[in-house]
Amino acid sequence: MALALLAVLSVPAHASAAANSCPKWEPLLKRHFPAKVVPVMSRIMYRESRCTERALSPVRKSTGRPDVGLMQIQGSWATVTRAVCKKQDVVKALLNAQCNVKVAGYLYNNGGLGHWRATSGK
């Protein structure tokens, strides 16, 4: 019982432990992804950031930049982020849910789910 309670307490209030998804952010996902992909993207968001808008990974040695926000967009997408979000400060822009999901939508439209595969960076 203590383990079950610990498991429940370790999941952020805005995340769904049962579905491992981010229902709070699904309306935003629906604006940038086809309806059939929204449940998948919600689960990816949960896996990437546990539904935390301001999630920031350590700086990657390979790029010299962190992965940022709900979808953990790689800092290497700076040019795309500047174009899509019309902001120069890439990290600050990607910490905003609207921008982060908009960039994720752009990536999906230009490569599908491959951007979130475990091997996409190799």
What role is predicted for each listed range?
Residues 1-3:
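N-terminal export and membrane-targeting signals
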Residues 5-52:
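Export/targeting segments at the very N-terminus of extracytoplasmic proteins
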Residues 19-20, 28, 39-41, 54, ...:
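Catalytic and binding regions of secreted/periplasmic enzymes and modules that target cell-wall glycans
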